[in-house]
Curated annotation (Swiss-Prot):
GO terms for biological process: heart development. This is Heat shock protein beta-7. It comes from Mus musculus (Mouse). SUPFAM superfamilies: HSP20-like chaperones. It is found in: Cytoplasm; Nucleus; Nucleus, Cajal body. Its main location: cytoplasm. Residues 16-32 have a biased composition (Low complexity). One of its GO terms (cellular component) is actin cytoskeleton. Residues 1-37 are annotated as: Disordered. Found in both cardiac and slow skeletal (soleus) muscle. The keyword Plastid does not apply. CDD domains: ACD_HspB7_like. GO terms for molecular function: filamin binding.
Amino acid sequence: MSHRTSSAFRAERSFRSSSSSSSSSSSSASRALPAQDPPMEKALSMFSDDFGSFMLPHSEPLAFPARPGGQGNIKTLGDAYEFTVDMRDFSPEDIIVTTFNNHIEVRAEKLAADGTVMNTFAHKCQLPEDVDPTSVTSALREDGSLTIRARRHPHTEHVQQTFRTEIKI
């Protein structure tokens, strides 16, 4: 496979042509990097415009983003974990919560009367090791917040077993 036919080459070429053709925006021209920048800086600058909202400073708390401006928060409440997600644009029949392989996934799809998709939502996260995956429950409140709870396994004291085995030759 030639390097000119690789998907990385096509993506870079496409990005360069779209960047150079959008001369109407002065902000995109000011963000253009010279050719001598290291590859990682170039890659970061290419994607930071599209994905910059996902990069959180280390000082911000970790939360589950629901919508721009609305974040869900994970909490430990006694013997359970709980997090909420803003789903006010969706009705209960639009929302599907699934658990699999120690992960939880929230998906929603709002359809228009003509069958076209008006709005979608998807979030997937890994459950902590001490969660019972069969105990996951969800409830949609009247204010549109979806609350998901999962029970923690009872804390058991881990006792390291020590033993010795002799094998006769």
